[in-house]
């Protein structure tokens, strides 16, 4: 197989994941990013499903769990701020075969950045 040099525009979640897999398959990804450093901030991500399967194949479940935020429950409220119902996260996690974490977007990005060989 010929090694390809592949330019990836954007050092975010998708860019670093793609760079990781291209490198695994023997190619030479080059990630370019407009920002001077990893971007901080962003929303909380409920991480499960297909994304979990990919992280498992990358061997990053332990890193993901180390960054996880534990919440006692998920609360649903009406427009007056009154709680309608609560679901505890232990129930959600159990229903998902323990393949669930909540973490911030920038924490996931950092995990993926660290997983990519630094010659990329």
What does each model-identified segment do?
Residues 2-6, 23-25, 48, 52-120:
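Conserved N-terminal helical subregion
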Residues 9-10:
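Conserved N-terminal Rossmann-fold NAD(P)-binding element of oxidoreductases
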Residues 15-16:
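N-terminal Rossmann-fold NAD(P) dinucleotide-binding loop
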Residues 23-43:
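Glycine-rich FAD pyrophosphate-binding loop
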